[in-house]
Protein backbone atom coordinates (compact mmCIF):
# COMPACT_ATOMS: atom_id res chain seq x y z
CA UNK A 1 0.00 0.00 0.00
CA UNK A 2 1.19 3.48 -0.89
CA UNK A 3 0.30 6.43 1.32
CA UNK A 4 0.18 9.80 -0.40
CA UNK A 5 -0.47 13.30 0.90
CA UNK A 6 -1.65 16.22 -1.18
CA UNK A 7 -0.93 19.61 0.36
CA UNK A 8 -2.88 22.06 -1.78
CA UNK A 9 -5.06 25.02 -0.80
CA UNK A 10 -6.96 25.16 -4.08
CA UNK A 11 -9.84 22.68 -3.79
CA UNK A 12 -10.18 22.22 -7.55
CA UNK A 13 -6.47 21.40 -7.95
CA UNK A 14 -6.62 19.01 -4.97
CA UNK A 15 -9.68 17.24 -6.37
CA UNK A 16 -7.95 16.96 -9.72
CA UNK A 17 -4.92 15.31 -8.12
CA UNK A 18 -7.15 12.98 -6.12
CA UNK A 19 -8.96 11.93 -9.30
CA UNK A 20 -5.62 11.38 -11.04
CA UNK A 21 -4.50 9.14 -8.18
CA UNK A 22 -7.71 7.17 -8.36
CA UNK A 23 -7.34 6.77 -12.12
CA UNK A 24 -3.70 5.72 -11.78
CA UNK A 25 -4.65 3.16 -9.13
CA UNK A 26 -7.31 1.62 -11.37
CA UNK A 27 -5.06 1.58 -14.44
CA UNK A 28 -2.12 0.02 -12.61
CA UNK A 29 -3.96 -1.99 -9.94
CA UNK A 30 -2.19 -0.04 -7.21
CA UNK A 31 -3.58 -0.10 -3.69
CA UNK A 32 -3.18 3.35 -2.21
CA UNK A 33 -4.52 5.76 0.32
CA UNK A 34 -4.44 9.49 -0.21
CA UNK A 35 -5.11 12.33 2.21
CA UNK A 36 -5.65 15.97 1.31
CA UNK A 37 -4.44 18.86 3.49
CA UNK A 38 -5.53 22.41 2.68
CA UNK A 39 -2.53 24.01 4.37
CA UNK A 40 1.01 23.21 5.45
CA UNK A 41 0.37 23.55 9.18
CA UNK A 42 -2.32 20.85 9.15
CA UNK A 43 -0.03 18.57 7.19
CA UNK A 44 2.89 19.07 9.58
CA UNK A 45 0.64 18.40 12.60
CA UNK A 46 -0.23 15.00 11.14
CA UNK A 47 2.11 12.03 11.34
CA UNK A 48 4.06 12.86 8.19
CA UNK A 49 6.20 9.73 8.62
CA UNK A 50 3.33 7.54 7.43
CA UNK A 51 3.39 9.06 3.94
CA UNK A 52 5.48 7.64 1.12
CA UNK A 53 4.85 10.46 -1.36
CA UNK A 54 3.84 14.10 -0.88
CA UNK A 55 2.51 16.39 -3.60
CA UNK A 56 2.93 19.89 -2.16
CA UNK A 57 1.90 23.26 -3.52
CA UNK A 58 4.60 25.87 -3.07
CA UNK A 59 2.29 28.85 -2.63
CA UNK A 60 0.14 28.11 0.40
CA UNK A 61 -1.56 30.47 2.87
CA UNK A 62 0.47 30.98 6.03
CA UNK A 63 3.48 28.71 5.78
CA UNK A 64 4.75 28.17 2.23
CA UNK A 65 5.24 24.72 0.81
CA UNK A 66 8.99 25.33 0.73
CA UNK A 67 9.05 26.12 4.47
CA UNK A 68 6.88 23.08 5.18
CA UNK A 69 9.23 20.88 3.15
CA UNK A 70 12.21 22.10 5.18
CA UNK A 71 10.42 21.26 8.44
CA UNK A 72 9.20 17.92 7.09
CA UNK A 73 12.75 16.95 6.11
CA UNK A 74 13.87 17.33 9.75
CA UNK A 75 11.70 14.39 10.84
CA UNK A 76 11.31 12.55 7.54
CA UNK A 77 14.31 12.92 5.23
CA UNK A 78 13.28 9.98 3.02
CA UNK A 79 9.76 11.02 2.04
CA UNK A 80 9.35 11.53 -1.70
CA UNK A 81 8.39 15.12 -2.43
CA UNK A 82 6.91 16.47 -5.63
CA UNK A 83 6.13 20.17 -5.75
CA UNK A 84 3.07 21.60 -7.46
CA UNK A 85 3.43 25.14 -8.76
CA UNK A 86 2.25 27.55 -11.39
CA UNK A 87 5.55 29.43 -11.30
CA UNK A 88 8.57 27.74 -12.83
CA UNK A 89 10.84 30.18 -10.95
CA UNK A 90 10.38 28.08 -7.78
CA UNK A 91 11.60 24.88 -9.37
CA UNK A 92 15.28 25.33 -8.54
CA UNK A 93 14.50 26.02 -4.88
CA UNK A 94 12.77 22.66 -4.72
CA UNK A 95 16.04 20.86 -5.14
CA UNK A 96 17.33 22.52 -1.95
CA UNK A 97 14.89 20.33 -0.02
CA UNK A 98 15.57 17.24 -2.15
CA UNK A 99 12.33 17.36 -4.09
CA UNK A 100 12.11 14.56 -6.62
CA UNK A 101 10.36 16.70 -9.20
CA UNK A 102 7.67 19.29 -9.79
CA UNK A 103 4.40 19.52 -11.68
CA UNK A 104 3.30 22.76 -13.31
CA UNK A 105 -0.29 23.93 -12.97
CA UNK A 106 -2.72 23.39 -14.52
CA UNK A 107 -1.92 19.75 -13.86
CA UNK A 108 -2.53 17.33 -16.71
CA UNK A 109 -2.80 13.56 -16.30
CA UNK A 110 0.19 12.64 -18.53
CA UNK A 111 2.50 14.81 -16.40
CA UNK A 112 1.03 13.39 -13.19
CA UNK A 113 1.38 9.84 -14.49
CA UNK A 114 5.05 10.37 -15.33
CA UNK A 115 5.93 11.96 -11.97
CA UNK A 116 3.92 9.45 -9.93
CA UNK A 117 5.53 6.52 -11.76
CA UNK A 118 8.95 8.02 -11.01
CA UNK A 119 8.04 8.35 -7.33
CA UNK A 120 6.69 4.81 -7.15
CA UNK A 121 9.89 3.47 -8.66
CA UNK A 122 11.76 5.02 -5.75
CA UNK A 123 9.23 3.47 -3.35
CA UNK A 124 9.82 0.08 -4.93
CA UNK A 125 6.13 -0.23 -5.76
CA UNK A 126 6.19 -0.48 -9.53
CA UNK A 127 4.86 -3.66 -11.00
CA UNK A 128 7.65 -5.76 -12.35
CA UNK A 129 6.17 -8.21 -14.78
CA UNK A 130 7.57 -11.71 -14.50
CA UNK A 131 7.44 -13.91 -17.53
CA UNK A 132 7.48 -17.65 -18.01
CA UNK A 133 8.89 -19.27 -21.12
CA UNK A 134 6.82 -22.25 -22.18
CA UNK A 135 7.96 -24.71 -24.80
CA UNK A 136 5.20 -26.54 -26.67
CA UNK A 137 4.79 -28.42 -29.94
CA UNK A 138 3.77 -25.18 -31.64
CA UNK A 139 6.92 -23.36 -30.50
CA UNK A 140 8.25 -21.33 -27.58
CA UNK A 141 5.93 -18.83 -25.92
CA UNK A 142 6.54 -16.08 -23.41
CA UNK A 143 3.61 -15.48 -21.04
CA UNK A 144 2.97 -13.13 -18.16
CA UNK A 145 3.39 -15.31 -15.04
CA UNK A 146 0.25 -13.77 -13.54
CA UNK A 147 -1.76 -15.24 -16.42
CA UNK A 148 -0.60 -18.81 -15.74
Sequence positions of predicted segments:
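CheY-like receiver
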Residues: 45, 51-126
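Short hydrophobic helical patches associated with two-component signaling proteins
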Residues: 16-21
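Helix N-cap/capping motif at the beta->alpha junctions
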Residues: 35-42, 65
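Conserved binding/recognition cores within well-folded domains
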Residues: 113-148
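A generic structural motif
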Residues: 25-34, 79
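Conserved acidic carboxylate
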Residues: 8
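Charged phosphotransfer/docking patches of two-component systems
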Residues: 11-15, 91
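Non-catalytic signal-transmission and effector/linker regions of two-component phosphorelay proteins
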Residues: 1-5
